[in-house]
Amino acid sequence: ALEDEEVAALKNAGFDEQLVADLQLFNTLIGNWDYALSLDGQGLWNTEVIELSDGKLVPVAGDFDLASWVTGKVLVTGPRDYLPELDDLVRQTRFRLSEIRLAVGDSRFGLAAARFLTHREAIELLIASAEIDPEGRENAMRHVDVFFEALSEVQVHGVDGLP
């Protein structure tokens, strides 16, 4: 992985755009709002970068200590007036997925969504068989349910309601 100083100096990382979209969806799935990831690599936060032998730079999601999948507490970053009738996890997930769709475009968002949908059952099986307490398992499964429901809503209805 690149050293912190090298990551801070990135100006034109040229990250793969689909990978960035996929990582943003992954962070949303686990309720990780404490990160920053850009195509050019500027302003990265809680994202590692590895350099392949051909010099290509690849971002890697990391530092999940504040993710609500881990803590059970949602760090709300979306505006309170965005779908206020929904609970924090649902609202935050919908808000973030809508932001991602706007940022990456319908095609990339659709491909990322399809990749996650393909793996939903495997994710659920891993959670069901993981050595975690019942409360942690319930929290993780709720994240999965909320994520996929929100993913469907954002794909079907678009990003209406964003401030």
Model-derived regions, located:
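Catalytic-core segments of enzymes that bind and process phosphorylated/nucleotide-bearing substrates
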Residues: 1-163
